[in-house]
């Protein structure tokens, strides 16, 4: 069960794109503080955040500083090294879990997961080269 995150808490968002911006705007309206972590400064989400952290997703010191500044963490895009989320999960709650990121990082895993759970998806085939594409 997910523990309730009370207004006034600081939510950390990994990624600074438009989705993070919309999330941050909604979270702030509900009374939360928002910190973002993004590779590039002045990101769309960073522009509306209470605090923006900038650095590589492999910069352990910068990630640690970000993690220490928040109560709970989420992510807004899938191009984050899974190991980073695994490390963060040992320090702070992270939602969704890193397993979700792993599934979303490739369309093959994403579609296979959804199909296995019984969700209706369009037929698909995974191809790795031109010969497999011709056969598909």
Residue ranges and their predicted role:
Residues 103-136:
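Active-site nucleotide/adenylate-binding loops and adjacent lid/helix of ATP-dependent enzymes
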Residues 1-105, 109:
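ATP-binding N-terminal substructure of ATP-dependent carboxylate-amine bond-forming enzymes
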């Amino acid at each position: 069960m997910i523990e309730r995150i009370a207004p006034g808490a600081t939510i950390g968002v990994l990624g600074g794109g438009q989705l993070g911006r919309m999330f941050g705007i909604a979270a702030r309206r509900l009374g939360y503080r928002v910190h973002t972590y993004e590779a590039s400064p002045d990101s769309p989400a960073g522009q509306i955040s209470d605090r923006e952290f900038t650095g590589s997703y492999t910069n352990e010191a910068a990630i640690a500083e970000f993690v220490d500044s928040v109560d709970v963490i989420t992510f807004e895009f899938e191009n984050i090294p899974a190991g980073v989320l695994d490390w963060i999960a040992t320090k702070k709650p992270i939602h969704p879990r890193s397993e979700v990121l792993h599934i979303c990082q490739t369309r093959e895993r994403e579609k296979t997961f959804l199909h296995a759970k019984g969700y209706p998806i369009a037929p698909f085939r995974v191809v790795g080269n031109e010969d497999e594409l011709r056969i598909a």
